[in-house]
């Protein structure tokens, strides 16, 4: 997509939607089902033909970094969207205040009160582990110098 407001990167992830078209290269692969040293007479059942479709994509991204002031309202909004964002930024968060007494002690995690051994930190669960994506590694190609790259359309 080209233009304003195309997306936001969170958790160092960016998703790109590709619409399938058949304008690339189609090719067929013919494979024999039996391997014999002699040349038997041709039979259609001795061969399997597969049709493959190859596509090549040239991806170009321009990222605009912005700075925001992390006020309590902004942090509350980010926390309501996804609390793991602020956890990855290593912000210590306290839950929202509650008026009832039982809610006051619900979030206490002191080892002196719970009498438990320290738990190892939980590994964050990948929400996309069951899905298949193409991975595009931008580590070596990422640069702040835009004049070093030709952008095509």
From Swiss-Prot:
- Report the principal subcellular site: virion
Q: What keywords is this UniProt entry annotated with?
A: Capsid protein, Host-virus interaction, Late protein, Viral attachment to host cell, Virion, Virus entry into host cell
Q: SUPFAM superfamilies annotated for this entry?
A: Group I dsDNA viruses (SSF88648)
Extract the Gene3D superfamilies matched here. Answer: Major capsid L1 (late) superfamily, Papillomavirus (2.60.175.20)
**Protein localization:** Virion
Entry's Gene Ontology molecular function annotations: structural molecule activity
A Pfam family recorded for this sequence: Late_protein_L1
Record GO biological process:
symbiont entry into host cell; virion attachment to host cell
Sorted alphabetically, the Gene Ontology cellular component annotations on this record are: viral capsid
| Entry similarity comment | Belongs to the papillomaviridae L1 protein family.
- Role played: Forms an icosahedral capsid with a T=7 symmetry and about 55 nm diameter. The capsid is composed of 72 pentamers linked to each other by disulfide bonds and associated with L2 proteins. The capsid encapsulates the genomic DNA, but does not bind DNA. Essential for the initial attachment to the host cell.
Instruction: Kindly state the subunit structure of this protein.
Output: Self-assembles into homopentamers. The capsid has an icosahedral symmetry and consists of 72 capsomers, with each capsomer being a pentamer of L1. Interacts with the minor capsid protein L2; this interaction is necessary for viral genome encapsidation.
Q: Any idea what this protein is called?
A: Major capsid protein L1
Whichever gene encodes this chain, its name is: L1
């Amino acid at each position: 997509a080209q233009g304003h407001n195309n997306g936001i990167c969170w958790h160092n992830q960016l998703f790109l939607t590709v619409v399938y078209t058949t304008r690339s290269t189609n090719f067929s692969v013919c494979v024999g089902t039996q391997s014999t040293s002699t040349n038997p007479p041709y039979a259609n059942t001795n061969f399997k033909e597969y049709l493959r479709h190859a596509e090549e994509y040239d991806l170009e991204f321009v990222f605009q970094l912005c700075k925001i002031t992390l006020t309590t309202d902004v942090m509350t909004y980010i926390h309501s969207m996804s609390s793991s964002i602020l956890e990855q930024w290593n912000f210590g968060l306290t839950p929202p205040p509650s008026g009832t007494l039982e809610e006051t002690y619900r979030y206490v995690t002191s080892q002196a009160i719970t009498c438990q051994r320290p738990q190892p930190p939980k590994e964050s669960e990948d929400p996309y582990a069951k899905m298949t994506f193409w991975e595009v590694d931008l580590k070596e190609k990422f640069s702040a110098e835009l004049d070093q790259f030709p952008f095509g359309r």
